[in-house]
Amino acid sequence: MKLVTTSRNWSKMAPEYIPGRCNIGRRGRAIRLTTGVVLIGLSIIFEIFALKPSNHLVRLGLAFPFYIGILACLEGSMSFCVLHSSRATYDLHEPRGFASKKSDTLEKVGSEDWKKLDRRKALRMHLEALSGAVLLALLLALT
């Protein structure tokens, strides 16, 4: 007797483009999330061990790698690439795992309303990443 019934296997279902919400697939999400976590971790380790005795203003320069890392983590967790948004494209089956113009599965966003939703989401993500990076850099610079 089966206790679990399988109605649909959601992991094998093809992803779908949703304006302002999803423009990358599973591989792109995984690579972006991993890249972001590694970049943030390496930046924190570098700050703790290499920049500890140096000037606090120099340590604030780590806001840039923090920004890139946080933005990559946001892209991975939200299934949304800001570069695809700026190009008005989406790619749910990225063969390389990053936004590339040479991808065979790259699609153009058709509607102007959809482009506007994508740009609004990208701007929000940039602001979240920037505020997180500045906050993290300030916290580490003041310690």
Q: Where do the language-model regions lie?
A:
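Membrane-interfacial helix-loop segments of redox and metal-homeostasis proteins
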Residues: 2-143
